[in-house]
Amino acid sequence: MDLDYYLIDAIAPFFTVSSDTPEVNWSKVPFSRLENGDGIDPQKAVVVKQAFHRYIDVVTTEGYNAISLDDMAHLVQHSFYPDQLNRKIDSYRAFYRQLVDYARAKGCRIFITTDILFLNRFISEHTGMEQRKNIRFLGRSVRRLFSDFPDLSGIIVRIGESDGLDVQGDFQSRLVIKTARQCRHYLKKIVQVCEQFDKQLIMRTWTLGAFPIGDLMWNPHTFHAVFDNLPSQNLILSQKFGETDFFRYQTMSPLLFEGSHRRIVEFQARREYEGFGEFPSYTGFDYERYARYLRNCPMLCGISVWCQTGGWSHFKRLSFCADSSLWVELNVSSTLQIFRDTTSAEKAATNFISRRYPGTDGDSFVRFLRLADKAVKELWYIPEFAVQRLYFRRTRVPPLFYLFWDTIMINHTVRKIIRRFVHERREAIEDGYRALHAVEKMRRLAEMLPIDTDEITFQYRTFEILAVAREYYFGDWHHDLQERIMRLITAYRKDYPEGFHVIADFNPVKFRKWLIKAVFRLSLRRHPHYRIIDRLVLLRFASLIYPLFRLWEKRRLPSFTRNQAMGIEVLFK
């Protein structure tokens, strides 16, 4: 396809000096860890700049022609900021000018990201958090950004998610847009500024379900309420390929074909829900199918590939930097080949491996990736659950339930819930072991390929826990099974102290089967259309129910569900 934008995130170089915490928030540049109090630490700036140069060299050679950089808040000064903050911003501006100049010299277009709305106490006091003043402040910020950085191609705006609970520093973003009407007011102001400067506004439709705007990414009514009669050649919509985050087992969102605005479709190379690049999780076979589908989309003008951004984890490989992942780089390369050159997934993979390791048997590598695809789809996911379309309030329920980021959950709550949706339980157990056998075949093939067999052994040991856990989820419980699982986990933790967190708790949770059925029947639906009970109860009063849910989930769900990202509370807003 001849597209205008082959966009990739450029967040990885910033972590070369700041990923020494136990858990890393990969969703944003860790600005506070780059600073020395007065501004950017000069020594860290040198390291980041060198890594950035190498990164740009690699991705432009690969064929990407645009990058995204965090963020507008750290590049725009305001008179009501204290002098110390404006001096710090000035140091960022000087540093970013060097990055922008280098990227532009390499033929890259640069887009600066921003949330609506980034805040601190000075902004809050200045606007009083009145919508009209917030919009004016945002418009003024965009105008100053383009005035001071004329080489930028535009900005990328996120409205449906804000900074994680762990984000520290001079700015934290907050969700301020609650309705389609409010969203239109903000967009009109930003589009007006973009038109004045001939810049592009890339508006991301990603939402987490908070407030009435929270179903924008999948609900056509909300989508049209926001974008209809909002024509502009300077407005591009950026949409994820499905109705939820970067998971498998999704059909393409029909909203990609709605309306008349140009589109960028988002894909993920560093699989935040599938190991963060610690084992092979090839996206090519799925993305080839999506590419065929998107050939019929006349509004498509680009793709956006996430190669480092996304998720919270202690896995710290940096794409195209220190200890980069072969599997992430494979996905980065193959995604571009599939969409730009209409290359098949198999050919894209063999092109990549033959360039990286000349003389490699391409057919064997493809067989290896087919086995990896089977292992992920049939053991990492539980197919019978993953294919079900479930909705809670304004959110499409993810097709992956007992695994999240770098944590595997094995407990009675998960067992009770997952059994509600999986009825072919014996087959699920058997399918899991067949998929585990595929990893064993991968290990044998890896010995004949330029692949680190230790990575595949790590994958096998991780997937082995999942296979045995299925016996607990879907089989009859007995004490010997519990001991067997715990022996596996203990040995795994000993051999892989930096491996996945495995949280196992076999203590029974007391709630009746009839109660589970009633709760799910009330709260979940199998179609996107809202029911009467959704409109009258769940969409209006769920925030009042949340305190009760919080008491329940403190005893039954791991603490990371409360402490990472925006916290589970966002689903009830």
Where in the sequence are the language-model features?
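Glycine/Thr-rich phosphate-binding loops of Rossmann-like dinucleotide-binding domains
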Residues: 77, 165, 247
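Substrate-binding groove of N-acetylhexosamine-processing glycoside hydrolases
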Residues: 1-10, 15-17, 48, 147, ...
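A generic structural signal for short coil/turn motifs at secondary-structure boundaries
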Residues: 121-123, 165-167, 213, 276-278
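Feature activates predominantly on carbohydrate-active enzymes
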Residues: 1-160, 195, 291
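Short, internal active-site loops enriched in acidic
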Residues: 74, 116-119, 161-164, 207-211, ...
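Active-site cleft segment of glycoside hydrolase catalytic domains centered on the general acid/base Glu
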Residues: 125-131, 161-197
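Alpha-helix capping and helix-coil boundary motifs
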Residues: 40, 84, 101, 129-143, ...
